[in-house]
Amino acid sequence: MGNSCRGSFKDKLDEGDNNKPEDYSKTSTTNLSSNSDHSPNAADIIAQEFSKDNNSNNNSKDPALVIPLREPIMRRNPDNQAYYVLGHKTPNIRDIYTLSRKLGQGQFGTTYLCTEIASGVDYACKSISKRKLISKEDVEDVRREIQIMHHLAGHGSIVTIKGAYEDSLYVHIVMELCAGGELFDRIIQRGHYSERKAAELTKIIVGVVEACHSLGVMHRDLKPENFLLVNKDDDFSLKAIDFGLSVFFKPGQIFTDVVGSPYYVAPEVLLKRYGPEADVWTAGVILYILLSGVPPFWAETQQGIFDAVLKGYIDFESDPWPVISDSAKDLIRRMLSSKPAERLTAHEVLRHPWICENGVAPDRALDPAVLSRLKQFSAMNKLKKMALKVIAESLSEEEIAGLREMFQAMDTDNSGAITFDELKAGLRKYGSTLKDTEIHDLMDAADVDNSGTIDYSEFIAATIHLNKLEREEHLVAAFQYFDKDGSGFITIDELQQACVEHGMADVFLEDIIKEVDQNNDGKIDYGEFVEMMQKGNAGVGRRTMRNSLNISMRDA
């Protein structure tokens, strides 16, 4: 089975059904909330919350279902028959893709195989019924899921979003197709993995957690069903899917809403006071299952499961644990520590000897992904940076929401620009170990107009993932911005005008033209522009970047 909507640990998704259901629905795992404070009977309350979804005839008694919708979110269109969940009109998905057989059916959602008409490439399309989006929180959940998928785009073990579309009845999320089935299926088929294979799988899973956390995202619903195989013949071609319960977080932020799946939920989530450490707990539960075939906290009822989670006793006596290595058990204990402060971070898990043994995972610090993007950005020439700013300003809100969160977190004085001290403090919060000199280099690289600060558009341009550049409409729009007279060429005069508009002085225009101009006609055509934008960054703009850095040092 390919990409699928969420299901429970026991219930398998339907597959092979070619008939499209009359209604799609929002994909969601159990999402718990309670307006009451935690009490000694918390397990009873939580169990009741988990069972609410099974009482479909009691919707009128659920206060979450009668929250009025905010008008800016639920905008009516001219025919008064639908609203825009995404906040804007999108192309008709059926003009771009052909939807065919069903890949999976979850509790509230359906995923279909879809084929891009222009290229013939297959993707997965998750369809969400707008009729099921009852509250403003439901709408915000869908928006946030799309925003987070855009924010995490480019990681090798995270499913890639292709685009989001909306019509009068549904929201459709088109994403990379994972045709190899679920990791869940492999666990059921084999019962358990060898320690070596379990270590390799754990490295992938925790690598996703580390990437999410470094970019300010907490997944909150990790489980085997949410990892799919791209290739059924490759056990390790895993991709994380389903970010419907994921949220953006700031360092030190505390969450109180109870979400997740019973077997995998961390004790602090049940106690309504948690942070990203809960994802590490969940990954530890998955590791336990990979090695034994059963979850560590087991009971016949949900209340019993919650009691076991809160007690925190881990069974290492039953088979096969007597023959499992001490190193593996040590890692599990440290991932399943009941105290979040004593639990390993995702990065520390990747450095644990059991994971690192035989070179499975490198024992070195990993900078957050945003830093690698900044480093790539520093190698670009000025034209490419200006083009990125043009593209960044045209991106949809869902594509840049995560970066906006990071910018606002770093811009502590709300001035609309990041100073060196704010950049340094912000990078430290996101786990950076860069030296001051390296941060200065990043600052200089991102500060396109040499103002001494990084404004919002410069930050977005410097940190947006480069796969956004592959979209033809963005490249065309950026080229047309520079080609003022519509001649099909960017001339040195037009480049000069663009530099003035962006407040860039002392730019070596001739050098920029020479670096991009392949046929030596003294101007840049569209093909040369596209090649520059899509070319590997390591060899782009080094001479111009050195000149720019020299200018910055002279100005200083």
Curated annotation (Swiss-Prot):
UniProt binding sites for ATP: 103-111, 126
Q: List the disulfide bonds.
A: none
Bilayer-crossing residues are none
The alphabetical list of record keywords is:
ATP-binding, Calcium, Kinase, Lipoprotein, Membrane, Metal-binding, Myristate, Nucleotide-binding, Phosphoprotein, Repeat, Serine/threonine-protein kinase, Transferase
Gene3D superfamilies linked to this entry: EF-hand, Phosphorylase Kinase, domain 1, Transferase(Phosphotransferase) domain 1
Where does the chain bind Ca(2+) 4? Answer: 517, 519, 521, 523, 528
What positions does UniProt annotate as the active site of this protein?
221 (proton acceptor)
Its family remark reads: Belongs to the protein kinase superfamily. Ser/Thr protein kinase family. CDPK subfamily.
The protein's name: Calcium-dependent protein kinase 5
- UniProt source species: Arabidopsis thaliana (Mouse-ear cress)
